[in-house]
């Protein structure tokens, strides 16, 4: 890779690393795994940086690499996932309620299959169109729509199965303690 392309890649990483880390954290539940996922994707992308003709598409390319890498990891392990109470850090300006909602969403996303989680993340968090999501995941637009429909139905079921009244009582208790 030419020196100019190395500098261009370094600048790209410097300016986009926060957004890319957020994308990685939406793909895997553990913050450390998200950092590993992003690092692996950056290493793989670095080797092919000169092959990306339109650098405006670098984010989409990197997301695709992250999704593929996450899928490789998922296939490699024998589903020995151990539930954990550790949740991703929230940004400083998040209110307590927003933090709790984000934590709940991150936890609920764990019930989805990797393909479903990828579709939900790209469509709803990354704000990609159906066609963009289909291209990024290598599937048809119809498959994206049906996968999203099933994933959202599964998320609704999971939300309904949880005791949301208990969560509301906990929130009221926290507010009383804070007052």
From Swiss-Prot:
DNA-binding region, residue intervals: 130-149
Family annotation (SUPFAM superfamilies): Sigma2 domain of RNA polymerase sigma factors, Sigma3 and sigma4 domains of RNA polymerase sigma factors
GO CC, alphabetical: cytoplasm
Positions of short motif Polymerase core binding: 36-49
GO MF term list: DNA binding; sigma factor activity
Keyword line: Cytoplasm, DNA-binding, Sigma factor, Transcription, Transcription regulation
Main location: cytoplasm
Gene Ontology BP annotations: DNA-templated transcription initiation; response to stress
Taxonomic superkingdom: Bacteria
InterPro entries xrefs: RNA_pol_sigma-70-like, RNA_pol_sigma-70_dom, RNA_pol_sigma-E_actinobac, RNA_pol_sigma70_ECF_CS, RNA_pol_sigma70_r2, RNA_pol_sigma70_r4_t2, RNA_pol_sigma_r2, RNA_pol_sigma_r3/r4-like
Location of this chain's protein in the cell: Cytoplasm
Free-text function comment from the UniProt entry: Sigma factors are initiation factors that promote the attachment of RNA polymerase to specific initiation sites and are then released. This sigma factor is required for normal cell wall integrity; it is recruited by RNA polymerase to transcribe genes with cell wall-related functions.
Family the UniProt entry places it in: Belongs to the sigma-70 factor family. ECF subfamily.
Protein name in the entry: RNA polymerase sigma-E factor
Gene this protein is translated from: sigE
């Amino acid at each position: 890779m030419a020196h100019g392309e190395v500098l261009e890649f370094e600048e790209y990483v410097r300016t986009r690393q926060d957004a890319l880390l957020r994308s990685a954290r939406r793909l895997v539940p553990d913050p450390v795994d998200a950092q590993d996922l992003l690092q692996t994707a950056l290493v793989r992308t670095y080797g092919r940086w000169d092959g990306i003709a339109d650098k405006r598409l670098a984010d989409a390319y990197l997301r695709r690499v992250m999704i593929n890498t996450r899928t490789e990891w998922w296939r490699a392990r024998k589903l020995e996932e151990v539930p954990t109470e550790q949740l991703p850090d929230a940004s400083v300006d998040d209110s307590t309620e927003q933090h709790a909602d984000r934590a709940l969403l991150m936890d609920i996303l764990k019930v989805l299959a990797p393909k479903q989680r990828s579709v939900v993340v790209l469509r709803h968090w990354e704000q990609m169109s159906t066609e963009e999501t289909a291209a990024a995941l290598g599937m048809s637009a119809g498959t994206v729509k049906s996968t999203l429909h099933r994933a959202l139905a599964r998320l609704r079921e999971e939300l309904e199965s949880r005791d949301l009244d208990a969560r509301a009582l906990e929130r009221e208790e926290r507010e009383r303690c804070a007052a």
